[in-house]
Amino acid sequence: MKPKFIVIEGLEGAGKSTAIALCQSFLNSKKIDFINVREPGGTPLAESLRTLVKAQHDEEIAFETELLIMYAARSQLMHNVINPALEQGQWVLADRHDLSSQAYQGGGRGISANTLASLSSMVLKGLKPDLTIYLDIDPVIGLERAKGRGELDRIEQEAIEFFQRTRMRYLELANDDNSIKTVDANQSIEHVHRDITNVLRTFFAEQK
């Protein structure tokens, strides 16, 4: 079986960390050799960019600046970690990927699809996740969960309307792409785990 690229996506408080732990357990049960990455981040430079883009600053950060920082971090991760791992036969399990930029910067910030497509093409060079599990949650519920974890970062402090637009774009993109599987994260954790496991089982059954 060729190495696969699996991504977990969702708004703040959707339960991505728990979902990733479940995926790790599933992959281990299948004796799959895989690595974990997160976006933005995953390399020393990309982690510095993560800190930079999430922090509060004394000046306003332009939407385009935020977008370019995200893609700069993604470029480092692709070049230094993801592409080499896949080439060496390892699977990749990612906490966020390009879909986050399409949803947050495209839907939330209103940056044009053409701009996003241009950056995506330059950085990804055609590489696309084999499976994306999108954890769909009501932004109000998700942000309440996120607040329970501690202080919110710069992006997490955006108005609820920002997250509503982001969610709408996530749902639109998931509806148009068969490789994106939507899981209702408003359910109990037991039901969410069941649905994620079913997605993974179906995905594996379809592989050769």
From Swiss-Prot:
GO CC, sorted alphabetically, is: cytosol
Q: Which InterPro entries match?
A: P-loop_NTPase, Thymidylate_kin-like_dom, Thymidylate_kinase
Catalysed reaction, written as an equation: dTMP + ATP = dTDP + ADP
Q: Which GO biological process categories is it annotated with?
A: dTDP biosynthetic process; dTTP biosynthetic process; dUDP biosynthetic process
Task: Please indicate which superkingdom the organism of origin belongs to.
Answer: Bacteria
| Free-text function comment from the UniProt entry | Phosphorylation of dTMP to form dTDP in both de novo and salvage pathways of dTTP synthesis.
Please tell me which top-level EC class this enzyme sits in. transferase
- Species whose genome carries this gene: Pseudoalteromonas translucida (strain TAC 125)
UniProt: ATP binding residues? 10-17
Question: What protein name applies here?
Answer: Thymidylate kinase
Mind listing the GO molecular function terms for this protein?
ATP binding; dTMP kinase activity
Hey, which family's this protein in? Belongs to the thymidylate kinase family.
Gene name for this UniProt entry = tmk
Q: Which UniProt keywords apply?
A: ATP-binding, Kinase, Nucleotide biosynthesis, Nucleotide-binding, Transferase
Report the EC code(s) recorded for this entry: 2.7.4.9
Output the Gene3D superfamilies linked to this UniProt entry: P-loop containing nucleotide triphosphate hydrolases (3.40.50.300)
